[in-house]
Amino acid sequence: MGEKITEEREFQSISEIPEEEIDATNDEEKLADIVENEIEKEIRKSKTRKCKTIENFYYYILRDGKIYPASDYDIEVEKGKRSANDIYAFVETDVTRDFDEFLFDIDYGLPSISDILKFYLEKAGFRIANEVPTPNLKYYIHAVVEFGEDRPQYLAVNIYDIDSLARALRIPQIVEQKLGNKPRTITADEFNDIERIVAEEQPILAGYTYDEALRIPYHYYVDHNNSFKDDALKIAHAYLQLFPTPYQVCYEWKARWFNKIDCLKLERLKPSS
């Protein structure tokens, strides 16, 4: 893991991010460390503001390992100051105070269909009206932070390959049927139509659609509604068979920063029902 950042600093613009805090992006482990370091910075800033948690946020990691807020980078691209071709990974964070929800998110917290579809289409050469393209994006990173009463407790970083997710959801076949093979700019209506087919019309998990298959396990694992148990277990098994296993790194908060732990430790901490 990279050197810990012990000084609290506010970055007002992209150009103010110091070069010495940038790591090279060569593999998933380094991507996870980049994300972990960025979340630590957000936690330190929240403590400076006397906040007891952090907000959900979205970042891009570039091929050279630099990390930027996604909205800021999009603006820079639109102004012609940055290149969308440099975007290598997209980072989404979720923050929760519920340990069961934390475990659910790291086990079943796949990206939204909208995000997977957008990234796949742009990699395939399509453009989506009024969207900054990410033609070279390779990874979708989902980071989940679990907070206790006044401090963070655990962090899990899941790294998914975009192409593998798209294939599991049969997105290439549906795109070919609806749009053909010739890349072009597509409308919002065309995008929404494909998203609806992928999420709501194809029974891909134990006879359930993608949207249904995420709601049912949530009711069982997080809400502890046992009436969903049988279907939830069937869906969970099908889920593990269908979707690629992400590269996963887990951390526990110790004093001032996160330390890596065996992800199995988190499962052992789950209260027995």
Swiss-Prot record:
Organism of origin: Acidianus two-tailed virus (ATV)
Protein name: Structural protein ORF273
Subcellular location: Virion
One Gene Ontology term, aspect cellular component: virion component
Top-level division of the source organism's lineage: Viruses
Keyword DNA-binding: no
Keyword Oxidoreductase: no
Keywords: Virion
InterPro entries from the UniProt entry: ATV_ORF273
